[in-house]
Swiss-Prot record:
Motif Bipartite nuclear localization signal positions after renumbering to this chain: 5-19
Assembly with partners or alone: Homomultimer; disulfide-linked. The virus capsid is composed of 72 icosahedral units, each one composed of five disulfide-linked copies of VP1. Interacts with minor capsid proteins VP2 and VP3.
Designated name of the protein: Major capsid protein VP1
Biological process terms in GO annotation: caveolin-mediated endocytosis of virus by host cell; virion attachment to host cell
Family: Belongs to the polyomaviruses coat protein VP1 family.
Any one GO molecular-function label of the UniProt entry: structural molecule activity
Region feature Disordered, mapped onto this chain: 1-21
Stated role: Forms an icosahedral capsid with a T=7 symmetry and a 50 nm diameter. The capsid is composed of 72 pentamers linked to each other by disulfide bonds and associated with VP2 or VP3 proteins. Interacts with gangliosides GT1b and GD1b containing terminal alpha(2-8)-linked sialic acids on the cell surface to provide virion attachment to target cell. This attachment induces virion internalization predominantly through caveolin-mediated endocytosis and traffics to the endoplasmic reticulum.
Length: 362
């Protein structure tokens, strides 16, 4: 029987070349928000990491992330919650570097949000069952945080557009909050008059506003709500989940005026005190957003830019109405060219919507 041939390379054979390393994005610079001021190339990718703190009410300096103790009214007409009982949306604007020095070009560069990695920070803090919570058993630990919970975040190139919906249109909300104006019974279902932009942090109560599904073409939002009295919070921790922000055309939110907007609301449930009172508990949210530069058609012709510049320099006057439903303008006349003197000064001549000359006798 012939000897078995040894596996492996023959003596004197040239060694195999090692495989080329995988290509990954080259890190140009890393730091704080001041890094955004560094000019980069057209193909550069920028990553922004930030976090939003919860706005639950914070009744005192020791209860950051908690609301004021809740109290329910006996009927709809007497409902008047206090300001610090109301969890509100958190929002922020992140300024991005200016990409265009010449706004008269046919094409411009805009920042485009491509992906986001996000998670709720501090979920293990809810394992604390020994700090002032109501006991489940006489000699046991405290009651864990439970009840209705809501987790929401949004990333966009402009402020999130909101739709107002109320549980009780007769509720009287306190000063310092922004709620739907002039509510009616229709406000408890769908009233298209209740529109707003999420343009202020800690001002829009979560119970009054939801993202508007008919708008927000330039934003992406995600949220879950779980209702119930004894529902436990279910949250995940991972740095491997990435949410793609591109639409079906492969385009992500375009950051208008070089501004990126992030919003969040993370209500984990109700904390039950030893006295039996309850408070909302909220946590912060972390964002890691990847942006790239996209070439777009210039939507602002030079005539628009000049007109806008001139209009901004015009002095504004808060005067009586001269346009709209209550306009005090009686008549406008337009003269063009000359004609022979008419014999009837009361004859009305005008051009209709079709551009035809019309004559009307009084």
């Amino acid at each position: 029987m012939a000897p078995t041939k040894r596996k492996g390379e023959c003596p004197g054979a040239a060694p195999k070349k090692p495989k080329e390393p995988v290509q990954v994005p080259k890190l140009l610079i890393k730091g704080g928000v001041e890094v955004l001021e560094v000019k980069t190339g057209v193909d550069a990718i920028t990553e922004v990491e930030c976090f939003l703190n919860p706005e639950m009410g914070d009744p005192d300096e020791n209860l950051r992330g908690f609301s004021l103790k809740l109290s329910a009214e006996n009927d709809f007409s007497s409902d008047s919650p206090e300001r610090k009982m109301l969890p509100c949306y958190s929002t922020a604007r992140i300024p991005l570097p200016n990409l265009n020095e010449d706004l008269t070009c046919g094409n411009l560069l805009m920042w485009e949000a491509v992906t986001v990695q996000t998670e709720v920070i501090g979920i293990t803090s809810m394992l604390n069952l020994h700090a002032g919570s109501q006991k489940v058993h006489e000699h046991g630990g405290g009651k864990p945080i439970q009840g209705s919970n809501f987790h929401f975040f949004a990333v966009g190139g402009e402020p999130l557009e909101m739709q107002g919906v109320l549980m009780n249109y007769r509720s009287k909300y306190p000063d310092g909050t922004i709620t739907p104006k002039n509510p009616t019974a229709q406000s408890q279902v769908m009233n298209t008059d209740h529109k707003a932009y999420l343009d202020k942090n800690n001002a829009y109560p979560v119970e009054c506003w939801v993202p508007d599904p008919s708008r927000n073409e330039n934003a992406r939002y995600f949220g879950t709500f779980t209702g119930g009295e004894n529902v436990p919070p279910v949250l995940h921790v991972t740095n491997t989940a990435t949410t793609v922000l591109l639409d079906e055309q492969g385009v992500g939110p375009l950051c208008k005026a070089d501004s990126l907007y992030v919003s969040a609301a993370d209500i984990c449930g109700l904390f039950t005190n030893s006295s039996g009172t309850q408070q909302w508990r909220g946590l912060a949210r972390y964002f890691k957003i990847r942006l790239r530069k996209r070439s777009v058609k210039n939507p602002y012709p030079i005539s628009f830019l000049l007109s806008d510049l001139i209009n901004r320099r015009t002095q504004r006057v808060d005067g009586q109405p001269m346009y709209g439903m209550e306009s005090q303008v009686e008549e406008v006349r337009v003269f063009d060219g000359t004609e022979r003197l008419p014999g009837d000064p009361d004859m009305i001549r005008y051009i209709d919507k079709q551009g035809q000359l019309q004559t009307k006798m009084l």
